[in-house]
């Protein structure tokens, strides 16, 4: 995968995690604490991975960080599933979109 494609994907992921953070804030107390923590962590990791990609072309390190980001995305998606129908649909959609974008990048990198 070309570095410019990785950077484009990471920009999309960061945008998706921005939307998830906004949805968590909008949901307020409806958002479970574990989901809130996962979304915050996913957002921070997405920003860190994007910065790493801009600074370095070390593919192995970048792949490892994307793998970690996907694990965080998995936890966020699972937290949404545990919350069930009580969760704001916009929040659930934002988390799923971020998770899917991360998963797609991981598949392309492996």
Where are these regions (language model features)?
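Amphipathic alpha-helical binding modules
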Residues: 77-110
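Amphipathic, well-ordered alpha-helical segments in soluble domains
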Residues: 9-20, 41-48, 68, 72-75, ...
């Amino acid at each position: 995968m070309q570095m410019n494609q990785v950077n484009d994907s990471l920009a999309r992921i960061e945008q998706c995690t921005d939307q998830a953070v906004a949805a968590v804030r909008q949901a307020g107390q409806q958002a479970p604490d574990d989901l809130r923590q996962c979304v915050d962590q996913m957002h921070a990791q997405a920003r860190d991975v994007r910065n790493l990609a801009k600074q370095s072309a070390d593919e192995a390190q970048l792949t490892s960080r994307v793998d970690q980001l996907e694990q965080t995305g998995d936890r966020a998606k699972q937290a949404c599933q545990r919350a069930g129908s009580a969760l704001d649909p916009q929040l659930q959609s934002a988390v799923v979109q971020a998770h899917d974008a991360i998963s797609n990048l991981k598949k392309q990198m492996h």
